[in-house]
A protein has these predicted regions:
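Ferredoxin-reductase
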Residues: 2-80
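Short, functionally important structural connectors and interaction interfaces within domains
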Residues: 20, 39, 65-68, 107, ...
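Charged, low-complexity, helix/coiled-coil-prone segments
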Residues: 15-22, 56-61, 114-126, 144-146, ...
């Protein structure tokens, strides 16, 4: 069993849990995921690793309760436990395999939409730990859906935008990216976009126009008899 140390609602319908999983914490890297199962009857659910603490032996996950199993998960509290917590799985971020000195020469920008902020954070944290501070643009529908602001601002140059203008500035993440490049003189060697498919589509249309190589992250779930996920970055 994998004990839950912390459980909280980060924002409206977005939840965060810190789980005791020493082996996973020891070996995971940004971009990887775990498969969790709350109980014997529950589905196996793939969730991106949002953070990890090797010394404490913990993994942080962030999720939105959409299906039946994740709706049950949100009711778990500190002291409860997952039956299964398998990982780390999937390919780490490409940054983890690059030469650090070469990576330090790159100008990197991340664009995150909604809960897509969760898989962006560990990549920013890893880069920061290796002496690289990237730019990060976080977009949300409204102020109440902005998550991990404190954590993100500690490891990146953070820009926040909301669809309704209720926090910082009104607009889309693409509006901020265009402004940074065309009006503030920023230049980027690579863009990483993680969020809703429609958001990533418009980021790619913009970065194509701006001639910025772009990586997007897609996490479709393939329901086989084992209910295993497939993850890919394009």
């Amino acid at each position: 069993m994998y004990k839950i140390q912390e459980a909280e609602m980060l924002a409206n319908n977005i939840y965060r849990m810190v789980v005791e999983a020493p082996r996973v914490a020891q070996h995971c890297l940004p971009g990887q995921f775990v498969i969790v199962k709350a109980d014997e009857e529950g589905e196996r659910i793939p969730l991106t690793i949002c953070d990890y603490d090797r010394e404490a032996g913990t993994i942080t996950i962030v999720f939105m309760p959409i299906g039946e199993s994740t709706k049950k998960m949100k009711d778990l509290k500190a002291g409860d436990a997952f039956m299964d917590f398998v990982g780390p799985l999937g390919q780490p971020s490409e940054f983890c395999s690059e030469d650090i000195e070469e990576l330090k020469k790159k100008r990197i920008v991340f664009v995150a939409g909604g809960v897509g902020t969760a898989p962006v954070y560990p990549q920013l944290k890893w880069l920061h730990e290796h002496g690289i501070t990237a730019d990060a643009i976080v977009g949300a529908k409204t102020k109440d859906l902005v998550i991990l602001e404190k954590e993100m601002s500690a490891v990146s140059n953070l820009y926040i935008t909301t669809d309704d203008g209720s926090y910082v500035r009104k607009g889309m993440g693409t509006d901020v990216l265009r402004d940074l490049v065309q009006n503030q003189g920023k230049q980027y060697d690579v863009c990483v976009a993680i969020g809703p498919m429609i958001m990533m589509k418009f980021v790619c249309l913009l970065t194509k126009e701006l001639n910025i190589p772009t990586v997007v992250s897609m996490n479709p779930v393939s329901y086989t008899h084992l209910t295993l996920p497939t993850t890919s970055r394009v």
